Amino acid sequence: MAVPARHTSKQKKRSRRGHIKLSVPAMHYDATTGEYRLSHRVSPKGYYKGRQVVNNNDNGNN
């Protein structure tokens, strides 16, 4: 089984992982609902690209 010849120090390990970061989610202002929402997603009110694509009139009972 292969093992490292030298112990990897904290500095070496952290500098290697320094470029790994969380990205900011892509959000934009939706003029139809007047709220910010994630890009390429349907708004909570059911609008996408200015059109209503999901009907939210039902109360969740099937």
Curated annotation (Swiss-Prot):
**Keyword Cytoplasm tagged:** no
Sorted keywords for this record are: Ribonucleoprotein, Ribosomal protein
> Biological process (GO) annotations?
translation
Under Gene Ontology molecular function, one entry of this record is: structural constituent of ribosome
Which SUPFAM superfamilies is this protein grouped with?
Zn-binding ribosomal proteins
Annotated region Disordered: the residues are 1-20
Quote the Pfam families the UniProt record gives: Ribosomal_L32p (PF01783)
What does the entry list under GO cellular component? large ribosomal subunit
Q: What transmembrane ranges does the database entry give? A: none
> What family does this belong to?
Belongs to the bacterial ribosomal protein bL32 family.
PANTHER family annotated for this entry?
50S RIBOSOMAL PROTEIN L32 (PTHR35534), LARGE RIBOSOMAL SUBUNIT PROTEIN BL32 (PTHR35534:SF1)
The name on file for this protein is: Large ribosomal subunit protein bL32
The species this protein was found in: Lactobacillus acidophilus (strain ATCC 700396 / NCK56 / N2 / NCFM)
Q: What is the lineage of its organism?
A: Bacteria, Bacillati, Bacillota, Bacilli, Lactobacillales
